[in-house]
């Protein structure tokens, strides 16, 4: 059996900068920087090497608003160099960083399990129905405006969920 002989589920097309993903477009290669996002020169250099090696998309971590703004500077530097690779902000536990990144990069990756909630401390939490409804409302009050900002700036959103980054509320 050939690794090139496979079937794909039908999907929609999504734009990440100038890169189209999904539907009948080829599977895209994404890499991730291991530089400090606040080191603009080193991050731009590595992103440029990643693009030259054949990646279609590059992801950087944005722990806070400062890193999210740095990604905008990295993007400007890459465009100045003629490198068009779209950038993805990898966000965990910090909706303010997600809001900042939405205006700076082509895609923001968030985890809805920790978008508003604090990091896990592995506590068993018990909620009344009323408390749980308030928690969900908190998420809706933050997530809705985030999606609206992304729509306004044509910023793609990847919702990534994995067990290790779910909040205590979900667990």
Name each region found by the language model:
Residues 1-60, 65-87, 92-171:
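Alpha/beta enzyme core
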């Amino acid at each position: 059996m050939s690794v090139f002989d496979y079937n794909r589920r039908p999907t929609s097309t999504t734009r990440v900068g100038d890169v189209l993903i999904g539907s009948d477009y080829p599977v895209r290669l994404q890499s991730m920087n291991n530089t400090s996002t606040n080191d603009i020169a080193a991050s731009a250099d590595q992103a440029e090497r990643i693009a030259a090696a054949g990646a279609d998309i590059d992801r950087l971590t944005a722990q806070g608003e400062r890193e999210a703004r740095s990604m905008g500077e990295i993007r400007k530097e890459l465009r100045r160099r003629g490198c068009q690779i779209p950038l993805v902000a990898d966000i965990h536990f910090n909706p303010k960083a997600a809001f900042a990144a939405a205006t700076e990069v082509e895609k923001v990756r968030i985890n809805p399990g920790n978008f508003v909630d604090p990091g896990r401390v592995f506590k068993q939490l018990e909620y009344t129905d009323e408390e749980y409804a308030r928690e969900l409302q908190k998420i809706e009050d933050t997530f809705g405006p985030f999606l609206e900002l992304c729509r306004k700036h044509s910023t793609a959103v990847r919702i990534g969920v994995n067990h290790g980054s779910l909040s205590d509320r979900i667990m």
